[in-house]
Swiss-Prot record:
Protein name from the UniProt record: ATP synthase subunit beta, chloroplastic
One function term, GO molecular function aspect: ATP binding
GO BP annotation list: proton motive force-driven mitochondrial ATP synthesis
Record-stated family: Belongs to the ATPase alpha/beta chains family.
Keyword ATP-binding: yes
Binding site for ATP: 172-179
Catalytic activities: ATP + H2O + 4 H(+)(in) = ADP + phosphate + 5 H(+)(out)
Pfam families membership: ATP-synt_ab, ATP-synt_ab_N, ATP-synt_VA_C
Highest rank taxon of the organism: Eukaryota
UniProt EC number: 7.1.2.2
Lineage: Eukaryota, Viridiplantae, Streptophyta, Embryophyta, Tracheophyta
Subunit field text: F-type ATPases have 2 components, CF(1) - the catalytic core - and CF(0) - the membrane proton channel. CF(1) has five subunits: alpha(3), beta(3), gamma(1), delta(1), epsilon(1). CF(0) has four main subunits: a(1), b(1), b'(1) and c(9-12).
Encoding gene (name): atpB
PANTHER family in the cross-refs: ATP SYNTHASE, ATP SYNTHASE SUBUNIT BETA, MITOCHONDRIAL
Amino acid sequence: MRINPTTSVPGVSTLEEKNLGRIAQIIGPVLDVAFPPGKMPNIYNALVVKGRDTVGQQINVTCEVQQLLGNNRVRTVAMSATDGLMRGMEVIDTGAPLSVPVGGATLGRIFNVLGEPVDNLGPVDTRTTSPIHRSAPAFIQLDTRLSIFETGIKVVDLLAPYRRGGKIGLFGGAGVGKTVLIMELINNIAKAHGGVSVFGGVGERTREGNDLYMEMKESGVINEQNLAESKVALVYGQXXEPPGARMRVGLTALTMAEYFRDVXEQDVLLFIDNIFRFVQAGSEVSALLGRMPSAVGYQPTLSTEMGSLQERITSTKEGSITSIQAVYVPADDLTDPAPATTFAHLDATTVLSRGLAXKGIYPAVDPLDSTSTMLQPRIVGEEHYETAQRVKQTSQRYKELQDIIAILGLDELSEEDRLTVARARKIERFLSQPFFVAEVFTGSPGKYVGLAETIRGFQLILSGELDGLPEQAFYLVGNIDEATAKAINLDEESKLKK
């Protein structure tokens, strides 16, 4: 149920209907509010400050109760800027946690942390809302079967398969294709699984959020003509927002995803970009609340906060939430408490490599650095496991030989090593793939490759059956049959040129 502070029952004044307090202290985004004795709000309740500033501008700030201080005071964190607030202003206790709209009405729209649309496309149907604070599903509700979540992207499905209802860390710097990979996953999930996606932009650049929205409209992931046909809901709490909003925007996105899982019984993809910013915002709030900092200045409740978010991302008997989280690693230090705490929750890691992106191999997923707990013979089967291991071994050997090739050239290698290098280069190119969402930029149609087709293709390369085909035939194709067809076309083109 939602208690909306903007509406009141006819004939009853707001004062009689609501629990009223007054601002006692303001320290940046942290407000202390005094309430009458016996009228204290609960932890996590949403409070609304309404009034006018000194210039007469309307103020409407929502806060969340974090601590009960005693002496009838509560300490709260604001979800928007506190400019213009003054001591003594009235604060209304809504009597419930923050609630946000959920369901089909959210598709194709952009929301802020409070669940308010920020895309200038009119109001959203708020008849179905859900509180952002919920407990994780009980043990008895969980679906613990190990099953692979097929993405249709060759390199991911073969070498670092995603678990249905699992959590995946997406590691990559700027400009290596994180956004395009995220959009392709959203597109493929919608087509292959009939599922929807929720994107939570946590503390990232506003420009990037805008770019993502524009690219989604261009590629058809968001359908402007008919929003209900869209495959994604977007929730943004960008870098410019106060720490309270950045700390809670992940929960807003998760709440929308939970509705699609529990009520609509779908397989949902939840993207969080960037999970490090969630921790960073929690650290800022923790210091402002006066808690003693822990290691490296992080909040003492780091593991608890991370756990309360991550434990809600899971498979139940109804459906699943599979989460892909971009992870920023501060100063490339993997032992920093923020990434170290995140690693404990991940089932797979997809590492994007600048070296591969520079070669034009997209998706630029590093086949050797990317890992998955699902890549075990008892889960994926002996054939898949063996093929993946041989692909990795061949790629690793090629990597070891690169220094020798750079100094002495290919001719100095043994016959066996030359064969390994030739196959590794074919594998490297065959791991690239044309994306549906990149069609508008590249002009080449996207390809969804099933897991069985992927395994068959790499087995043919490893067995040596395709040693006679040129390398470029394997670049940016779908399955292996397309590579052989491309080789024939290349051969015919070269004959025509002669």
